Design a protein with these regions (language model features):
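Aromatic-anchored glycine-rich loop motif in surface-exposed flexible loops
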Residues: 1-57, 70-75, 209-231, 242-279, ...
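Short, surface-exposed recognition loops and adjoining beta-strand edges that mediate ligand/DNA contacts
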Residues: 12-15, 46-65, 69-145, 270-283, ...
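Elongated scaffold/linker segments in the mid-to-C-terminal portions of large proteins
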Residues: 91-239, 244-248, 308-354
């Protein structure tokens, strides 16, 4: 996360002395190599895929993280590693321990810890035993409120809701004319989905993907704190990682098409949405948007595809304007927090242009 968001963070490891220490700053490329080497070094120490208890990492988790790491290697290091991304995605797939959940929406419900063959690793929440105001409690409560409940008619399983987060029409446009047929479209637009004012919660696109409701329709155990677990890695990601590598000419084309169509078939409930051949990269980006919205992957994907700050791909309120516009490329990284720099001025340097 530090490598992805900040690029060049302060760094400590087991060799760092105890006591008052001013951590050195590590480059993004150096941190990439460190993470890669650590994941490979611990592989034999981890339990086999699906052999660990729910919510704990195993070998498949390490392979999935390596696949994600290699998929973004060109951004992080300047050298592409798409073939390696496909190799480690295939390790997870070939383990045979995971399969796509039949019902997409049940991946994101209060009992998603049960009978879930797709999730490799999750951040676990329990409304009785792990109460906090962040995590899934925030994500679910901030997505709903009085207006949202009226507009969607969907029970979110929470007491009231906080009113706040909603998507722009950009998410709506990803689904195009398939809102009624793509089962991943757990969204509801207010009118056209346009947001005229960012302070108005009754505008835009409501997202009810994550809910504190069980697959049987019962509310979670606590209306103030969510039971829903957050999926960090899903098999669908490994399928789409491989497919992207195939489109980029770095993995088997036939296998990439098969994996892509498995994701599509789950979304549509049949082969009606399947591709006859691998689509263009722009469609892979769109497919990832449809599959992983609200799961924290879109920014990273847009940067990898060169679309996060560019002017050839805009969405409402990009760069802070209603119509959307290009942004400065340096904003692909967040600034190093000022408190960190002030506490460690000799070692830390701010990211360029901040």
């Amino acid at each position: 996360v530090l490598m992805d968001l900040f690029g060049n963070p302060p760094f400590i490891d087991e060799s760092t002395p105890t006591g008052k220490v001013y951590p050195r700053q590590i480059s993004r490329k150096e941190l990439f190599s460190y993470v890669e080497s650590e994941l490979k070094a611990i592989e034999s120490d981890l339990k086999a895929p699906k052999a660990n208890v729910y919510g704990r990492a195993d070998q498949a988790t390490a392979w999935a993280l390596l696949s994600r790491l290699y998929l973004n290697a060109e951004v992080y290091t300047g050298t592409e590693r798409y073939a390696d991304a496909a190799t480690y995605a295939e390790r997870v797939i070939a383990s045979g321990k995971y399969s796509l959940h039949t019902n997409y929406d049940r991946l994101f419900l209060a009992d998603n810890n049960l009978n879930n063959p797709e999730v490799l690793l999750s951040v676990n929440y329990d409304g009785q035993r792990s109460q906090n105001w962040g995590g899934m409690t925030f994500l679910i409560n901030s997505s709903t409120g009085g207006d949202a409940k009226k507009a969607t008619g969907v029970n979110m399983g929470v007491n009231g809701g906080w009113n706040g987060n909603r998507a722009t029409a950009g998410l709506l446009n990803l689904f195009g004319g398939n809102l009624a047929t793509d089962k991943r479209a757990l969204i509801k637009a207010v009118g056209s989905g346009e947001i005229k004012s960012v302070t108005e919660f009754n505008e835009g696109v409501y997202v009810y993907k994550f809910r504190n409701v069980t697959s049987a329709g019962a509310n979670g155990s606590n209306g103030d704190h969510a039971d829903t677990d957050f999926p960090l890695f899903r098999l669908a990601e490994l399928y789409l990682n491989f497919a992207e590598a195939a489109v980029r000419g770095k993995a088997d084309v036939a296998k990439g098409l098969t994996y892509l169509n498995l994701v599509r078939a789950r979304a549509y409930g049949s082969a009606v949405g399947n591709y006859a051949s691998l689509p263009a990269l722009t469609e892979i980006l769109a497919e990832r948007g449809r599959e992983f919205y609200w799961e924290g992957q879109r920014r990273t994907d847009l940067i990898r595809f060169g679309k996060f700050t560019s002017g050839d791909y805009v969405w409402p309120w990009k760069a802070g304007v209603k119509e959307g516009k290009a942004s400065d490329a340096y904003r692909q990284l967040y600034p190093i927090p000022a408190d960190d720099i002030q506490a460690n001025p000799e070692n830390l340097r701010q990211n360029p242009k901040y």
